[in-house]
Every structure is written in structure tokens, then in C-alpha cells.
């Protein structure tokens, strides 16, 4: 693994496309999600420790609630739990107009587009949330394609959403570079056959990014 100090996977590059996760990579949204999750869990009498909650970073909402339902024996149907949580998230994000893009992410996207890279989002979030959040931070139209976790059978850390992104891009996974902030996401991209940049975001919790090929703390490392 190469550290941020010697990071240069795009200079020169074997890649034709860059595939971004969204939350914690493009938008600094994980703290808001943690807050919504704590409130949702509390309504069912559940309190998770920090490490337990951080373990869900990168997985789909459906997979998170399936695990919670099984672990704590919740009675409501999974569909009901998921629908209520999705409504809460969409309402909170729509109201939270101060959500910020990750520093330098917009500049990095422009840098990639000027150099002819195809760019994609591969997020575990529902498609409606992806569109809403990317629109809020001003980069929805910058992406060639979007792949959502609700469109595939298996959530991260399975590779499904990254394979879907590569298919829609028309680029082999081996020619895509993925950018992820979570352990689950890094594992998913690696399983898809992509090389991976782990983006170290302290707001995403204590994430083990060591399976990534490179680890960075800011996007200026790319633009060399």
C-alpha cells in the first residue's frame, strides 16, 4: 500500500474512469446520517455503541435494517422499517441545506473531466437520495453515470454496485479507480477488480482502510 505522501496513481495512469462513493467522499454527510440513525434506533429502544454504528458505514439502508431487525428481534416488517428511515433521511437532507462538499472534491472532478476521464458514483444510498444530495452540493450533472445500492442484489462489501457502475460506464473494472471512505466500500471495490484509493475522513468514523491500494487525506494529492 502506498501512503498519501507518495500517492500518484493518476500520473501516469492506467485508468479510463474514476468511480466515487458519495457519502464521506463527495459530501460530508456521515455525521448527519449518524444522527438520524441514532434517532431511528432510539424509537425502537435501541442504542448502538460508536463502533457498532460505524460498522454500517458503506452498507445499504436495507442491509443495515435487516441486520438490526434480526439482531434485536424487531417486530415491524423490514419494508416498514426501511421506508420510515428513508423518509427521515430524505426529509433531513432536504432541510439540511448547509451540507458541504468534501474539500477539493469539486476541483478534482473538474480536473478529471478536463483530462477525459469518465466519472461515476457507486453509492449504497437509494437513488432518490443520491440525486438529492449531489444536487445540493452542486455536482449532480458532472457524473457520466450513477449506480445505487438499491439497484443491486448484494450491498457493499459485495462488489455488485461497483460492477454495475463499470458496466454502465462501458469500462472494464480493471480500468476503473475507486475512491472510498469506508472499510466496507474498499472491500467492495477490491472485490470488483478495481484498485482503490481510501479517503481518510474522520467524520466517517474509525474506518480500517488498510486494504486500499493508497490512502489519502485530501484530493490535492491527485492533481499532480
What kind of region is each of these model predictions?
Residues 47, 69-110, 115:
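Metal-dependent phosphoesterase signature
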Residues 26, 101, 119-122, 154, ...:
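Conserved SAM-binding loop
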Residues 2-16, 110-113, 126-224:
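Asp-based, Mg2+/Mn2+-dependent phosphohydrolase catalytic module
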Residues 40-78:
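Alpha-helical substrate-recognition element adjacent to the catalytic core
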Residues 46, 117, 194:
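Short phosphate-binding/catalytic loops that engage adenosine nucleotides
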Residues 3-55:
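Active-site neighborhood of HAD-like aspartate-dependent phosphohydrolases
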Residues 33, 37, 41, 61-68, ...:
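Hydrophobic alpha-helical core bundles mediating ligand binding, dimerization, or RNAP-core interactions
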Amino acid at each position: 500500500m502506498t501512503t498519501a505522501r507518495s500517492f500518484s496513481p493518476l500520473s501516469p495512469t492506467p485508468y479510463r474512469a474514476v468511480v466515487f462513493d458519495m457519502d464521506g467522499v463527495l459530501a460530508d454527510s456521515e455525521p448527519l446520517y449518524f444522527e438520524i440513525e441514532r434517532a431511528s434506533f432510539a424509537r425502537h429502544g435501541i442504542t448502538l455503541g460508536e463502533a457498532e454504528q460505524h460498522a454500517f458505514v458503506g452498507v445499504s439502508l436495507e442491509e443495515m435494517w435487516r441486520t438490526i431487525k434480526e439482531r434485536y428481534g424487531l417486530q415491524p416488517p423490514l419494508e416498514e422499517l426501511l421506508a420510515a428511515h428513508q423518509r427521515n433521511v430524505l426529509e433531513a437532507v432536504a432541510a439540511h441545506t448547509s451540507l458541504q462538499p468534501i474539500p477539493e472534491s469539486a476541483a478534482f472532478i473538474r480536473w478529471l473531466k478536463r483530462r477525459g476521464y469518465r466519472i461515476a458514483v457507486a453509492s449504497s444510498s437509494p437513488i432518490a437520495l443520491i440525486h438529492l444530495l449531489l444536487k445540493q452540493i452542486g455536482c449532480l450533472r458532472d457524473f457520466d453515470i450513477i449506480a445505487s445500492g438499491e439497484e443491486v442484489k448484494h450491498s457493499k462489501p459485495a462488489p455488485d454496485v461497483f460492477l454495475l457502475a463499470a458496466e454502465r460506464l462501458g469500462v472494464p473494472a480493471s480500468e476503473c479507480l475507486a475512491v472510498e471512505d469506508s472499510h466496507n466500500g474498499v472491500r467492495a471495490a477490491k472485490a470488483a477488480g478495481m484498485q482503490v484509493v481510501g479517503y481518510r475522513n474522520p467524520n466517517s468514523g474509525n474506518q480500517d482502510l488498510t486494504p486500499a491500494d493508497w490512502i489519502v487525506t485530501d484530493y490535492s494529492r491527485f492533481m499532480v
